[in-house]
Curated annotation (Swiss-Prot):
GO molecular function, one term: K48-linked polyubiquitin modification-dependent protein binding
Amino acid composition bias (Basic and acidic residues), ranges on this chain: 606-630
Positions of region (Disordered): 1-209, 564-630
Ubiquitin-binding domain (UBD): annotated span: 508-560
Pfam name, any one: MINDY_DUB
Top-level lineage group: Eukaryota
UniProt KW Transmembrane helix keyword: no
Catalytic residue positions: 267 (nucleophile), 449 (proton acceptor)
Biased composition (Polar residues): 24-33
Xref: InterPro entries: MINDY, MINDY_domain
Phosphoprotein is among the record's keywords: yes
Protein name in the entry: Ubiquitin carboxyl-terminal hydrolase MINDY-2
Length: 630
């Protein structure tokens, strides 16, 4: 609920927080104690005990001695209706509670004065309700029993029975000291208060020095376990919650985290958070590896509340509150995508939308490079001062027009959009290089995607947030030097680095290198075995000439080898032919000898006849062989 000018009354210490005239809460009978969690200062909403009927404000300083008369019921409004609550952090937390809590948990502290005031008014164990967590719904039942004029309290602390503001109304910005109070984004302490209530009971029984109903602070050895519990609780309550991995880099000689992206899509939340992380405006716990989208939103909201101006005029304050209210309404879109409508006349010219207020409040520049070259007159005339949405509508209307000039303009505008589908032109790249300041951290919009960008020594670099490079320590930035998107990877100091180390070269490339090396070795050994005289090769010969000579030598040896194979085949064929011929001549002569035995004279004649064809066959074979060799 926005606070009007007539209700802007400062709340001084020692004065009871009563309702301003005309600013009563519509649900005063069901209000409950609200505790601000997170890194910012905590604020307790002032409430009255249902048993005593007296108002007590719990904060860094006790307001029990207020100006309200004893015994008179006083209706106190929640934090959302307080017009201005300027409390310092030193007044809100006791010295014992200065220790920074582990992210994902929210510290709940109370000063000794507050504890004494709570005991006097029935807020402690001696009171009617005690300071223990109530199950969901008990706050409303006690409130109904006590009456609508006296808001009841089941204890001094409660986070499970929150009563959010009515839809359409945003809480006052001065009363929000932590982003966890926003009903749109429940904090991690609410998860623990509902789902981890049973886990806190044994710790209280063991004598842990923790307030009842509070989230206990864990030691360094329990950080990982508690983060896992918070992550599991967030997944249970928000099944569609996104989880992001954290990559730690050495940025300007300091260990700095960046949030990686698991899916490619429009996620301005990561681009904004990475700008704040690289600027050291937002810090994460050391060695944190996983973070949820809800935690990122909480970090961002706390930073927005911490950076609100303190000393400004009334008009500026009202304007800032209106902008903050509009920004809170669109914060949930940061996880999916913002409605950004570029104009083609400047790198920082966008059509005004509520989404752009987020960048203005965070003081983060937003750039794009989709510009029209002013030297091309027909495109300048066709596009004009239109935004992207207006240009699309103009193209549709021009196509349906009967005027040939309008049809031509629509065609030129359509060609411009088709030719610059990457949403980056060379003219826009030149304008970006000249506009972005040296060392500036900003957000770059291109292809419906938001990236973290910086400028180093006159060159633009985009932060590599792809989860695939999570373990690549030397791949941090990617150069933006052309419109094709084929930049070079660099490390955190903007030195060119390959995507992988030499030890982790792609296995297929390594196998190919090994095969080529083995082939070269085999050729070298073969050449050495054939006694190639390398001394005859001149020293100044080029690689091409050497390759030609080696190829000629190889061709000569191959032809010689083929000739030898042909000669061997011809010799084998002639030998088989002679064997078959001799077998055919021996067959008819052997039959008479076996049929009738002859005398010694006949046998001598037969032996002569056998020797003659043999000699003739040998002569024929010699002639054939000599012909083949020639």
């Amino acid at each position: 609920m926005e606070s009007g000018p007539e209700s802007l009354q400062p709340l001084e210490h020692g004065v009871a927080a009563g309702p301003a005239p005309g600013t009563g809460s519509p649900q005063e009978g069901q209000q409950e104690t609200r505790l601000a969690a997170g890194d910012g200062p905590g604020v307790w909403a002032a409430e009255s005990s249902g048993g005593k009927g007296q108002g007590a404000a719990a904060g860094g300083r006790s307001l029990s001695d207020s100006a309200s008369p004893a015994g008179s019921p006083q209706v106190l409004v929640p934090c959302s209706s307080l017009p201005r609550l300027d409390l310092k952090e030193s007044d809100l937390e006791s010295p014992a509670a200065q220790k920074e809590p582990v992210r994902g948990q929210h510290k709940v502290t109370a000063s000794p004065e507050t504890a004494e005031a709570g005991a006097d008014h029935g807020l402690g164990p001696e009171g009617d309700g005690g300071a223990r967590p109530d199950p969901a719904g008990t706050c409303q039942e006690e409130s109904a029993a006590a009456g609508s004029s006296e808001p009841s309290s089941g204890g001094g602390l409660s986070s499970s029975c929150s009563d959010p503001s009515p839809p359409g109304e945003s809480p006052s910005l001065d009363s929000l000291e932590s982003f966890s109070n926003l009903h749109s984004f429940p904090s991690s302490s609410e998860f623990n208060s509902e789902e981890g209530a049973e886990n806190r009971v044994p710790e209280e029984e063991e004598g842990a020095a923790v307030l009842p109903g509070a989230v206990p602070l864990c030691g360094e050895e329990e950080v990982e376990e508690e983060e896992a519990q918070v992550l599991a609780a967030s997944k249970e309550r928000f099944p569609g919650q996104s989880v992001y991995h954290i990559k730690w880099i050495q940025w300007k000689e300091e260990n700095t985290p960046i949030i990686t992206q698991n899916e490619n899509g429009p996620c301005p939340l990561l681009a904004i958070l990475n700008v704040l992380l690289l600027a050291w405006k937002v810090k994460l716990p050391p060695m944190m590896e996983i973070i949820t989208a809800e935690q990122l939103m909480e970090y961002l909201g706390d930073y927005m509340l911490d950076t609100k101006p303190k000393e400004i005029s009334e008009i500026q304050r009202l304007n800032y509150e209106q902008n903050m209210s509009d920004a809170m309404a669109v914060l949930h879109k940061l996880q999916t995508g913002l409605d950004v409508n570029v104009k083609f006349t400047g790198v920082r010219v966008f059509e005004y939308t509520p989404e752009c207020i987020v960048f203005d409040l965070l003081d983060i520049p937003l750039y794009h490079g989709w510009l029209v070259d002013p030297q091309i007159d027909d495109i300048v005339k066709a596009v004009g001062n239109c935004s992207y949405n207006q240009l699309v509508e103009k193209i549709i209307s021009c196509k349906q027009s009967e005027n040939s000039e309008l049809v031509s303009e629509g065609f030129v505008a359509e060609q411009f959009l088709n030719n610059t589908a990457t949403q980056l032109t060379y003219h826009g790249l030149c304008e970006l290089t000249s506009t972005v300041q040296e060392g500036e951290l900003c957000v770059f919009f291109r292809n419906n995607h938001f990236s973290t960008m910086t400028k180093y020594k006159g060159l633009l670099y985009l932060l590599v947030t792809d989860q695939g490079f999570l373990t690549e320590e030397k791949v941090v930035w990617e150069s933006l030097h052309n419109v094709d998107g084929d930049g070079n990877f660099c490390d955190s100091e903007f030195h060119l680095r390959p995507p992988s180390d030499p030890e982790t070269v792609y296995r297929g490339q390594q196998d190919q290198i090994d095969q080529d090396y083995l082939m070269a070795l085999s050729l070298q050994q073969e050449q050495q075995s054939q006694e190639i005289n390398w001394e005859q090769i001149p020293e100044g010969i080029s690689d091409l000439e050497l390759a030609k000579k080696l190829q000629e030598e190889e061709d000569r040896r191959a032809s010689q080898y083929y000739q030898e194979q042909e000669q061997a085949a011809a010799a084998a064929a002639s030998a088989s032919a002679s064997a078959s011929a001799s077998a055919s001549t021996q067959a008819p002569q052997s039959q008479p000898v076996q049929a009738s035995p002859s005398s010694g004279r006949q046998s001598g004649n037969s032996e002569r006849k056998r020797k003659e064809p043999r000699e003739k066959d040998k002569e024929k074979e010699k002639e054939k062989n000599s012909c083949v060799i020639l």
